[in-house]
Amino acid sequence: MTDNILFAFALTLFAGLSTGVGSLIGLLSKEFNPKVLTISLGFSAGVMIYVAMIEIMVKARESLVVGIGAEMGKVVTVLSFFAGIFLIALIDKLIPSYENPHELNVAQKLEECSENQKKKLMRMGLFSAVAIGIHNFPEGLATFMSGLSNPTLGVSIAVAIAIHNIPEGLAVSAPIFYATQSRKKAFILSFLSGLAEPVGALIGYFLLRSFFSPSLFGVVFGAVAGIMVYISLDELLPAAEEYGEHHFAIGGVIAGMVVMAISLLLFT
């Protein structure tokens, strides 16, 4: 059991720290390529949608059928899915749009900024870090519990969320870097925002460990699927189309689905 806990936590840490990877990519890149970002965001959406609908929803239903029976299991699976959508939509609603990391135009040329603009960018970057931390908290718990219940599923979710977190790291680091001209500050704040995932995993584990059961895991899986679909449709795909052509975004989605389908066939 201890090995399972450590493995699940390692997956969560991996997913969370990918925010720092996104920050590094943005800070070290000499030239912004919108096509690459468009394809990457589409790829992330494809991975998340495919994993959510093909893998996670199936696991949610299987767990709930074991826990509460076939008929109620089906109903609770669907309810859990939409509960996850409602939860992440509520979080988005509570965060004003200018503070939402997915609303930032990181492609904008900001080299020449006034002092007021720099202050605004710094505030935007800090709010983005907090917003991403709030988003990452339930994602961390979801990754951890998935890894604890089913290591293969946990890996799939961790990879999907890690890919999703990379552009978020860029969203935090870009405005902070342009405001301070400090790569170090931009990276540290982006890195810290990603640590919300392992923190969410630890807090969730200590609060819920006495309630672990197939039913609980099923509800969590259903909610995770809803969260991942919402993020893909509400955040990743619109952002992908904002930075590039529609066909590049859709190509990224299909590529993400193909890659995840092949990986699931090979490793499950």
UniProtKB/Swiss-Prot annotation:
It comes from the Bacteria. GO terms for cellular component: plasma membrane. Keywords: Cell membrane, Ion transport, Iron, Membrane, Metal-binding, Transmembrane, Transmembrane helix, Transport, Zinc, Zinc transport. InterPro entries: ZIP, Zn_transptr_ZupT. Zn(2+) binds at residues 139, 164, 168. PANTHER family: ZINC TRANSPORTER ZUPT, ZINC/IRON TRANSPORTER. This is Zinc transporter ZupT. It comes from Chlorobium chlorochromatii (strain CaD3).
